[in-house]
Amino acid sequence: AFLAFTNARLMSGIDLILTHLQFGKRIQNADLIITGEGSADAQTTMGKVAYGILREARKQNIPVLLVAGHIADTPSLYTAGFSGIFSIAPGPVTLEKSMHPEFAATHLQRLITQICKLLQAFRV
């Protein structure tokens, strides 16, 4: 009733932000997008930031890599359209340890370095 009374419309948070930032314009010349979140699973495709970024990138056929501290249900993430899914954690690690800023920064840097080296190897 409030929406009708105020002549407003309902919009998800990520859609509001992407629209405000003119994200579609900003990525027009991108060859690849790398995005991330703490935990990636089937819920990622239900409106999380990474999925909003993926939706916009797919409109322009830009591949999207997803990095996350924890990954579950990779089949649904690939089905959604992510081109690659990578875990920041180098192996089994407690949630407490994985959230320590120094641990996260070290392993995120390691992972991004590996991804960049892989991309360089396949550059034509």
Please report, for each region that a protein language model flagged, where it lies by residue.
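N-terminal loops that bind phosphate or other acidic moieties
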Residues: 1-124
